[in-house]
């Protein structure tokens, strides 16, 4: 769409009452038409939310647009060609005739923009997935048929997008959330920022989790046959396969010559030992989308105990050889280009990095080490061992109780209840609320933009219904119906968005374009261009719309706290507001019932290997520090704080608490986890260390009686 400078340009705002042009506003604020109606703190909060939004399954375009959405879309993750040229070589990571899927394709091209005296070569890394978070990621969506044009001796067109984020629509708009029917209503579920959400609506916010797991074998250890049978040894799922229901992605067993006769039988190799094996858990049912196997070639030159037993490495060797073949093709291509172009050869930095990595991965042309010398291959300063296996898998993340949602005005809340369609509040005509939030939240937070957005979308819905009624009037011929429908829309635009009305008068002059606009409204409703510098945006503009159209509201039928259906005495509004989901979810717990401890009796520090050694979290994300203790002491008696600190650090108290949790019929209702008559305070290991040092100096601590009786 062509943008005229006299309409959209910043030079036309001076002398106006509202000068909040999108070019004057910062990131985030220029996405909000009601930037001048929200408090500064809530506007800043929404800006911080932009970095917390995952890619969701079924996003939609917002009904009220500022015009910057497509500009945001230009800066999302894409796989695109940077310069004009010709594709020279295409290399797959895993050939499809040998493997089920191929997670990566490398397209090497020669640029045609650097003259004949410079041979500039680059590469496009076409990977099927993107991960920039500890678990949230997304699978790239192919852009049309552009991937089919990636062939040798085919032209490479600058700017051509091969694949992109699923958040972009066909027009390039960045879609972060979903336009949702919201109801602001006082319910027992909406207090304290609670959100009552519709299950079918939450399914639209399903996102993709992508994680990786690593196993290092060969240092007197090996992968057991978790996913194989008597004839095929598989230490992990195949590419394109899924992690089994038990959740174990890989299991590593130490090699013991004395126990090999019982630990390395076909039956024993297929059964994990939950006590002595190093288990690496993933997500049950997750699909493996990438596998990378690294190998230390220096171990091949000597016969030592660090090599994997024969036959056990057949799966690892197959993936390693396929990846090794791709890296050797890169090296062969580089040497071919050197012979062909000599000093005129210039490599794109990313291509240069890949060539360097290929030499390191394949150990190509390396200096032969003397017999008996030890030069070990490392990856990020960690020894590779005989084999280093990296699995990448994906799984669905479905929002649940505990997930956090927010409006584009910083009006966030936490899902506390999920309801079916018949449990959600609704109008008599069947309009169902997708979510229910506190009716006073926008007032208390001073983010009135949330109220204005809901009302504006309600008016747009009413005008859309007027257009549909006109188009169903059989007393008019087709041309008259379209003419009247377009006139209704233009009248609405003149009130709701004068800038959009003026823009359409200048650009949409042909009858066919007007018919096309009416058809788009009939198909998907009204989308308003409503920049934040619109005059009188907010309460004044809403008042004009209400005087002209009247705000349609109805009584709401809802399920009360007694499980009975009730009808509200007052009429209430159910209309669309744009809702985004934040990375806060309900399945990643921050605390644990019992922490993991060292053999010294104090809390253990978790390593990368320990993080996934059990299905759940071993330790809390944060232990109690000085600041937390002082806050607790300000509110609680000192003996309660001492008891809280004693339980995880006192071996006897910790053992008693674990036993109480395991043996309790309902672990959420334990009358007494630690009996202090049997296990008194003072067994904290940290206190015992201090007490021991003081004893060596002739000092002892004891409780003294208070004047009011009892001990202090």
List PLM regions with ranges.
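Long insertion/accessory domains within large nucleic-acid-processing enzymes
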Residues: 1-712
